Amino acid sequence: MTWLLNWREVAVLDANAEALGVKVSDLMAAAGKALAHKAATMAPEGEILILCGPGNNGGDGFVAALELIEFGGTVRLIASHKSQKGEVAQSFRTKCPSVEVWKEGCDFGTPSLLIDCLLGVGLKGAPRGNIAKMIDWVKPNNPPLVLACDIPSGLGSKKFLAADATVTFHAEKQDMLYIDVGEVTVAPLPWPPETVNCGPGDALCYPPLDPSAHKGERGRVLIVGGGPYHGAPILAGRAAARIGCDLIHVAMPRNAVDRATWPDHLIPERLFDEDHLGERARDEIFKLLDEKSFDAVLIGPGLGRLEETTNMAREIIEKLSELEIPTVIDADAIYALDEGVWPKGLTGVATPHAQELRMWAWDEEPSNILAAEDIPSESRVIIRTGSVDQLTGLEGRYCECIGGHPRMATGGTGDLLAGAVAGLLAQGMTPWSASRLACYVMRVAGMMTANEFGPGLLASDVPPHIARALSNITAD
């Protein structure tokens, strides 16, 4: 894996590794030993002062201390709190011969090296409490060398501890573009290769439920499709609802609206065009976009490929780029895209199967289609759907989603995936995180559905299991 990880992705991949059978103690041991090895090369003589925070970053520090002591080093340990938050970190702490708890006025001493294990990449915002006080305590003492564990504490805020060197794990982190990280060493972790693929850890990015939330605050989606195939937008809408989105509007030609069987939770938008969407529908959809605050739009399911319809889809996609509304481009709407080009300014996800991707990309790699403007690294994704979903994002992001059941290779399941992605985008997830979680949840839901229905599985059987699969891996 080559992309720069953010703090959410680190937690996701740690959880995926644990689900694959990797013990937290093994991860901590590997991190601490790598840290100790670097420390020994930086300060072969003299005392090494290790500052440990209350989390797993502190646990890495305790492992490093044990390793250094075993090989004859002189180590002084100071913890920010009386105990660690996690059992594994606490178990390593109790193995250390002596751990001081920091208090104001504590003597700094004359260490040859300070190891910063106060905070890892999981911190959001500036350091607080004892951690902030310890950083203020360190700075005037001006230690000769500082080695950071994973990332310098407080990096990116006004209160941080600059490092001469940093040992980070598995891959560099986004904040490491700062000069204050010093020389960076990337140490491996005992993660199986599939750790980076979609997995249960992706549920950590699912937006938590606000107890005071009102109707509509979990997202509003517009689905544009239908015409020759009225069932596809309905399936997409059902998936968006079952993945937690509040309000789902489905815009179709009036004859398609009249033919469809409408679930109670979907809101029909009956467009004037009778059988397929064209210029008049474009104007109606523009009006909808102006009148209602949609958090995400899905265009394509069941749309058809008439020239008038394709032209309409192209203009709507351009409008969505202007409005900066996250968008999922699926099925027939992919034929509205210019060859080998991502729509300028658009944030979102495209979900082509192999044939659609060949038509759109020709000889271009998906990563080349995405690359262009200066935008956040999680803003664009191409999901090549199939027996193995292949997800390509910006700046080297790539992963796969495996598993599920082969009976999910049936008509309508692609519409479900597109709807699930749109539902997550509407709830505020980034295109990259939404794509990963939607792909994983669909695989789990597909397995549940296949176990219930066997050879008779239909795409319409899947949506209730989307909710069950999501519930199994989230805290809600």
Outline where the language-model segments fall.
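Internal gly/pro-rich beta-alpha loop/helix module
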Residues: 111-113, 118-198
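Small-residue (G/A/S/T)-rich helix-start motifs and N-terminal tracts that mark the onset
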Residues: 1-82, 90, 165, 176-331, ...
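Conserved nucleotide-cofactor-binding alpha/beta core module
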Residues: 87, 91-96
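A generic structural signal for ordered secondary structure
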Residues: 95, 106-109, 145, 222, ...
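Short amphipathic alpha-helical segment within the helicase RecA-like ATPase core
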Residues: 77, 87, 118
